Amino acid sequence: MKIKNKKFIIEFIGNSQLKKFLNNSKGRLKKLSEYFQPLHLNEKQTSITIKIVSNDEIKSLNKEFRKKNKVTDVLSFSDEIASGDIAIADSYILNKNNTINSQSFFMLVSHGLLHLFGYSHYDRQSRSNMRFLENMFMKFIGLKPVHED
């Protein structure tokens, strides 16, 4: 499934479970597009791929690109021109009954997009800014904020 606006095109890659979840989340995906459009400052339209991956795959990516040999929740990769990729570990978004948790899914998507659009959390101020934007996004799409104020 793809979502598109003047600033970016996002393609989601995953199994049939993800496709079903995305079809049931069209309203939130539309709001995702609305929320992130003004935060994306690149003049060119950006192509973004968001892929749900296994723990083994994200661990391998984390080791290769960040030199950390451990599983993580989300990784973002930008080529600085007009595209980017986000990998999300399935273990961080699946409920015990193996369905996708909306809260976790949209939080990690927002976190990855903020990184692609130039935001970071390397110090207290940047972490506070990022958490604020993540909380505002979650409220905007009708979900609970994930960070305490």
Language-model segments: residues:
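An acidic/histidine-cluster motif and surrounding catalytic segment
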Residues: 1-108, 114-149
